[in-house]
Amino acid sequence: MSQDPILTSKGSQEEEDFFGLDNFFPEPESPLPPPFSFASYDIPANIDFYVPDHRKSLILRLVGSHPLWGHHLWNTARTLSTYLLETPQITQSRHVLELGAGAGLPSIVCVLAGSSKVIVTDYSDEGLLDNLRFNVDVNLEGEEKERIAVDGHVWGQSVDPLLGHLPKGQKYDLLILSDLVFNHSQHDALIKTVEATLTSSSTQSYDPSNPSAPLTEPSILVFFTHHRPHLAHADMAFFPRLAESGNGWAYEKVVEEWAGAMFENDPGDKKVRGTVHGWRAWRVRDGEERGEKPSRISL
């Protein structure tokens, strides 16, 4: 991942003047280059909700550089955000927690799509968290801003501060994990946080003739790209490890979409590096076997 993101005509990471950002975010008088860059997410034409200044895009500020890769708006976050907008039943009136959020695009989208409470988190680094707050302020106003909060969290550590954002005794209905499973050494810590923050499954019983859990079932969305194709198997190891945790988990594929390679000259098959995979996982219900379920999509 040594090369700058590709600039495309569809908003992957456009030149700032394309969006009029020179006027929106005035250049500092200092001769030094600004520590931030900007990217945008174009709202699908069939989705209608209000964005400040009647913009058709969400504007995301990215940290100038960071070892946790928060200085890019990943194609995975774009694809996941579109999925959330096109699958409203999974987000509306829900308590949502995003882990390792980077620029926070999916969380902002959840607020606009009607989630009742959204907590957007990243590693407890003040630069990352301040940048998340900036993106919330730029893209949300009024009552919408009251439904989102920014917090720091180290995977596997105490979740009490995260649960403290909700009414006593409640947990989250939806967890968002966008481009996190590449961090193979942290799978166990990530699963520990997932287990501790997702609410228990609903009372809906398992139907063998329809093995997929309803979209309203408490679940986690795990979207990612195999940025290092030779380690794809290690990315995928997250799912069987999740399935064996706690009382067991089931999972199904919900998205497979070509989004383009983030870094043109990186090693490995370009098609693999440019394809976003989206999975949904839930705790097994009574009588349900853990593990992979039939995909919801036609591959």
UniProtKB/Swiss-Prot annotation:
Q: What residue ranges carry the coiled-coil annotation? A: none
Taxonomic superkingdom: Eukaryota
Q: Gene Ontology cellular component?
A: cytoplasm
- TM ranges: none
Q: Where does S-adenosyl-L-methionine bind?
A: W74, G100, A101, G102, D122, W155, S178
| Keyword hit for Cytoplasm | yes
> What is the main EC category here?
transferase
Q: What is its EC number?
A: 2.1.1.-
**Is Phosphoprotein one of the keywords UniProt gives this record?**
no
Gene3D superfamilies for the chain: Vaccinia Virus protein VP39
Q: Which UniProt keywords apply?
A: Cytoplasm, Methyltransferase, S-adenosyl-L-methionine, Transferase
Q: Name one GO biological process term.
A: methylation
Principal localisation = cytoplasm
The record's GO molecular-function terms, alphabetically, read: N-terminal protein N-methyltransferase activity; protein-lysine N-methyltransferase activity
Name of this protein: Protein N-terminal and lysine N-methyltransferase EFM7
